[in-house]
Amino acid sequence: MILYIATPYGFCSGVKKSISLAEKVLSNEGEVYTLGALVHNPKVIEELSKKGIKILEKNGFVEGKALIVRAHGLPQRDIEFYRTLGNRVYDATCPLVKKVQILAEYLNKNKYKVVIIGEKNHPEVIGILSYTDDQGIVVENEDDIKKIENYPKIGIVFQTTQSLDNALQKVNLIMEKGKEIRIFNTICPETIERQEKAKKLSEMVDLALVLGGKNSANTRRLYITLSKKIPTYHIENIEEIDKSWFKEDNKVGIITGTSTPNDFVEEVVELLKSLYPLEIHLV
């Protein structure tokens, strides 16, 4: 069996920074809560939980504690609320997400109708929307675009894990809705790179394994890209892998979402090694 592993794999830089900050705060504070799941990967959340990092779910109430803003960010009002309760709030928002928040706030203050291309219910998008005083428009599909009125000034930003192809299609449809339109490409470069690697893998292999959380937006998009071309399996844990999927003469591809730990890749590689002799290539 020949195995092609798409690079980069494992955590993106934003996830690394968020986890590093959480562990540092835990070391200094002793007791720590994250405001929602820090990242969208159950394996990572389980490991953080074992270390003592707890999750404060939506509408949870604590006072005088150390709290960490999740990598996807939070609405401004939530952060302000927890601070009024005497909590020490540490911001682990991905720097690229923070950039989108700042841009959305800038555009809103300068009288642009802010359009966020992304998923309405994704925590990142909900957070960005708050920086427009909740006056922005979230575009998830073409029906959302049809509802947009004509505005003199429109500013467009993107959920950082959007696929570039999907985003460009929507931008083209929005162009006729405003006289002045400013577009900021806020899609994460690592997300774009992994999408391109998914396309490349689809031309090289017989089947693909997409490793990452089922609740991870960027991982789902990798799965969608690959599954259009070849048999593809979205794997969250090793128990989901069925050995009957593989044959000795297979060319198999592995690609990971941006919050998938390296050790999960290694775990899957070891499983494949136990099935057939394995020739490994990085692509």
From Swiss-Prot:
(2E)-4-hydroxy-3-methylbut-2-enyl diphosphate binds at H40, H72, H122, T160, S216, N218, S259. One of its GO terms (molecular function) is 4-hydroxy-3-methylbut-2-enyl diphosphate reductase activity. GO terms for biological process: dimethylallyl diphosphate biosynthetic process; isopentenyl diphosphate biosynthetic process, methylerythritol 4-phosphate pathway; terpenoid biosynthetic process. Coiled coil: none annotated. Dimethylallyl diphosphate binds at H40, H72, H122, S216, N218, S259. [4Fe-4S] cluster binds at C12, C94, C188. Disulfide bonds: none annotated. Belongs to the IspH family. Catalyzes the conversion of 1-hydroxy-2-methyl-2-(E)-butenyl 4-diphosphate (HMBPP) into a mixture of isopentenyl diphosphate (IPP) and dimethylallyl diphosphate (DMAPP). Acts in the terminal step of the DOXP/MEP pathway for isoprenoid precursor biosynthesis. This is 4-hydroxy-3-methylbut-2-enyl diphosphate reductase. It comes from Dictyoglomus thermophilum (strain ATCC 35947 / DSM 3960 / H-6-12).
